């Protein structure tokens, strides 16, 4: 990294719930003199069935670096496995083409698992918020 160049943090968001928690982090990254935001939108955000919540991110004015659609399979155990496999491949391709200095994920949904797996295999440092939290319902 050249002197004065910002470190790039890829923030992965797949749902409205975790985006609400990541929004302040994204805002701080945008304002940072040392770090830059590389916002990657995936999962339910890009699904008509789940409300196309990417529009909320756009309304907030946050720049979206990439949109990675992954919900192409049925909501079955096999379909989820297929989604995870495809998502790992898509995240790996994106991270390889436009490598961040760090990948930031929140939670443990399968799209987050896929992004974390790709980052780990590619030896990109991973920051993980709220992994292992227990949710009910």
Q: What spans do the regions from the language model cover?
A:
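N-terminal subdomain of nucleotide-sugar transferases
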Residues: 1-44
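Active-site and donor-binding regions of nucleotide-sugar-utilizing enzymes
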Residues: 8-13, 20-25, 71-137
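Flexible, glycine-rich phosphate/dinucleotide-binding loops
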Residues: 18, 46-48, 135
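Membrane-targeting and insertion segments and their boundary/processing signals
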Residues: 27, 61-65, 119
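Anion (oxyanion) recognition and catalysis
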Residues: 30-31, 58, 120-121
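Conserved nucleotide-sugar phosphate-binding/catalytic loop shared by glycosyltransferases and other
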Residues: 36-80, 90
């Amino acid at each position: 990294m050249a002197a004065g160049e910002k470190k790039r943090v890829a923030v992965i968001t797949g749902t409205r719930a975790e985006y609400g928690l990541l929004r302040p982090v994204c805002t701080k990254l945008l304002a940072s003199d040392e770090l830059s935001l590389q916002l990657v939108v995936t999962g339910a955000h890009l699904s008509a069935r789940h409300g196309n919540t990417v529009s909320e991110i756009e309304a907030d004015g946050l720049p979206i670096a990439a949109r990675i659609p992954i919900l192409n399979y049925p909501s079955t155990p096999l379909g989820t496995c297929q989604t995870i496999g495809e998502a790992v491949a898509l995240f790996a391709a994106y991270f390889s083409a436009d490598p961040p200095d760090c990948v930031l994920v929140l939670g443990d949904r399968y799209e987050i698992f896929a992004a974390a797996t790709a980052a780990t295999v590619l030896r990109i440092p991973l920051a993980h918020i709220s992994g292992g939290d227990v949710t009910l319902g």
